[in-house]
Design a protein with these regions (language model features):
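N-terminal small/glycine-rich loop or linker at the start of catalytic domains
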Residues: 7-24, 86-102, 131, 136-145
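Active-site gating/metal-coordination segments in enzymes
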Residues: 95-131, 208
Length: 295
């Protein structure tokens, strides 16, 4: 499988990345091991996780995914050398009090401590790509549309966060840095400050992108192109809506698999993917695909 360079970093990854947010919730450890083994056998060299996972987030499964991956790596001698390992530090708690005691900020100290925790759980010496999971700033992320300047505190500055990330890079604990759920403004500021002050340059932005989520095309695409920052597109199948498995039954109707994510978790149905318009659009895309002999 060919490799793609991430931004201006020295990381080269396969076009397919294994996302792991279900490990520790829908997917138990034994099944997760099978998935990881299969992925490695098929040539995928890129694994992404986060300290917040498993999803849907709750206190009982906080950090669970990293622990499972760490157990797998410790039992697979030689696997680590073949892989690009990416994880994320959680942003402000945002109604998740188990994250740093409900802090509304992500300080430099928080970043340093979170990195140590991820290294320990993953049982590795260096994180190849370390990402900020969502901004400290109030932004329309996770299905939001409109920017609300009056909501939320600005918190720790981007400059201070970059300085903390620089310490991790200099210590050999992180190779490259990235962002997630970011805006064009945020990406531009991270790159501008990095270039102005000689700090680590963002290599990637991990945002949702699919037929049902085209927000990347609202100026973020140009920003990434001009600044040479790579997009890591998450939820390409829109939480399973684009697989067609909900087309006939709906999200909770008779015949729906009880283990299907949007059926099993009410919290997921209350978010962007559970909106009636999302299912209606997915059904129309499925019909269009069938008309053209596509799956």
């Amino acid at each position: 499988m060919k490799k793609i360079q991430l931004g201006q970093s020295d990381l080269h990854v396969t076009p397919i990345c294994l996302g792991t947010m279900t490990f520790g919730e829908q997917v138990d450890e034994a099944t997760a091991f099978d998935i990881l083994d299969r992925s490695l056998e098929r040539g995928v060299n890129f694994i992404d996780t986060a300290e917040m996972y498993a999803v849907p987030p709750r206190a009982e499964t906080f950090n669970a995914t990293e622990k499972i991956i760490g157990n797998w790596l410790s039992q697979r001698p030689g696997a680590r050398q073949k892989l690009v390992m990416a994880t994320k530090v959680a942003g402000p708690s945002r109604n998740m009090p188990w994250i740093r005691g409900g802090s509304p900020d992500l300080t430099a100290k928080d970043i340093l401590e979170a990195c140590e925790g991820s290294l320990r759980r993953l049982k590795i010496d260096v994180i190849d790509l370390y990402q900020i999971h969502w901004p400290v700033r109030s932004v329309p992320a996770f299905g939001g549309v409109y920017y609300q300047p009056a909501s939320g505190s600005e918190g720790t500055s981007i400059h201070a966060q970059l300085e903390a990330l620089q310490l991790l890079v200099q210590a050999g604990k992180v190779r490259a840095i990235g962002l997630s759920n970011e805006t064009p403004y945020g990406v531009h500021e991270f790159v501008r400050l990095a270039e102005q002050y000689g700090l680590p340059r963002v290599a990637t932005v991990q945002n949702g992108y699919s037929l049902l989520n085209r927000s990347v095309e609202n100026a973020l695409d140009e920003t990434l192109h001009r600044l040479n920052v790579s997009l890591l597109a998450y939820s390409p199948l829109s939480f399973g809506l684009l697989t067609g498995k909900y087309d006939v039954t709906g999200l909770t109707g008779p015949g729906t698999s009880p283990e299907a994510r949007l059926t099993k978790f009410e919290s997921s149905r209350k978010q962007r993917w559970g909106r009636p318009a999302a299912l209606a659009a997915a059904r129309r895309y499925s019909a269009l695909a069938r008309e053209h002999g596509l799956t």
